[in-house]
Amino acid sequence: MTEIYDFDKSAWDIKGPIAPIQPTTYSDGRLVPQVRVIDPGLGDRKDECSMYMFLLGVVEDSDPLGPPIGRAFGSLPLGVGRSTAKPEKLLKEATELDIVVRRTAGLNEKLVFYNNTPLTLLTPWRKVLTTGSVFNANQVCNAVNLIPLDTPQRFRVVYMSITRLSDNGYYTVPRRMLEFRSVNAVAFNLLVTLRIDKAIGPGKIIDNTEQLPEATFMVHIGNFRRKKSEVYSADYCKMKIEKMGLVFALGGIGGTSLHIRSTGKMSKTLHAQLGFKKTLCYPLMDINEDLNRLLWRSRCKIVRIQAVLQPSVPQEFRIYDDVIINDDQGLFKVL
């Protein structure tokens, strides 16, 4: 049985929206580079120069003899670095990078990125830029099927998104814990509703924001579980959630991310599941890659957050990764 509990909008009023990147072009049609700075935190970190950097751009043919042919729109997450440089100067250096892109495959399709340009201001992000990086193609590209293999490709940076890490630490919940299932436990999930306003160009105004499209995504926080074989009631779980004093914000980790901070009391079991952290980060890049790509340049804001209490999925249930093809019979087989 599923129970739903609505959070008061005051829990996300301050840091709920993200401003869009409005596309503007030069006279020849090329996009004008822009930078966006997001601060989803409350400002209690002593070191104010830590930031997460995320690049957006065009995957195009690397042909010095003619005008480049754009193949797809892509992104390159650079991760966390420390810098006191102005965002505009960081953007300028990023647009001068010579980033090579290569399409390959592993468990799924991949994109490989590596940079051939010496770094100065972007040195704090050298591990990704100099050493190279590989990503799930669907997480960082909107149309990987259009990227050819027989023509060298480059990633031309157009936009930069910087997320200032002003909170005293963000914690990404380990994947094993997110997949943890327990007998007689109540799963605590969040259903987040976003209102999306795509970048439609400068000077254009949406008269009725209520008519803008909405999208939802769901994240798993943890499980409420009693030591005995009994199950907590929904009302008791709701009381525990209210005591946590959750505050929500949107950031730019991996594109768009949900940031959660507990300002109250958290149950010992749940606190342990979350690595004894009270400031959490859930990148949509990992949760819902399709929605994340849609939000790369869009204005969006939180309009509703609901706690969803559900029975934990039984451990005997098989997940998709446990299904293989039986070579003997040519049929799907559940291990």
From Swiss-Prot:
Record keywords: Host cell membrane, Host membrane, Host-virus interaction, Lipid-binding, Membrane, Viral envelope protein, Viral matrix protein, Virion
Compartment list: Virion; Host cell membrane
UniProt-recorded Gene Ontology molecular function terms: lipid binding; structural constituent of virion
Record note on quaternary structure: Homodimer. Dimerization is critical for virion formation. Interacts with host ANP32B.
Source lineage: Viruses, Riboviria, Orthornavirae, Negarnaviricota, Haploviricotina
A GO term from the CC aspect: viral envelope
Top-level taxonomic group: Viruses
Source organism per UniProt: Measles virus (strain Halle) (MeV)
Similarity section: Belongs to the morbillivirus/respirovirus/rubulavirus M protein family.
InterPro entries to which the protein is assigned, alphabetical: Matrix_C (IPR042539), Matrix_N (IPR042540), Matrix_Paramyxo_C (IPR055413), Matrix_Paramyxo_N (IPR000982)
Record keyword Membrane present: yes
GO biological process, one term: virion assembly
Full protein name: Matrix protein
Gene: M
Principal location listed in the UniProt entry: virion
TM region positions: none
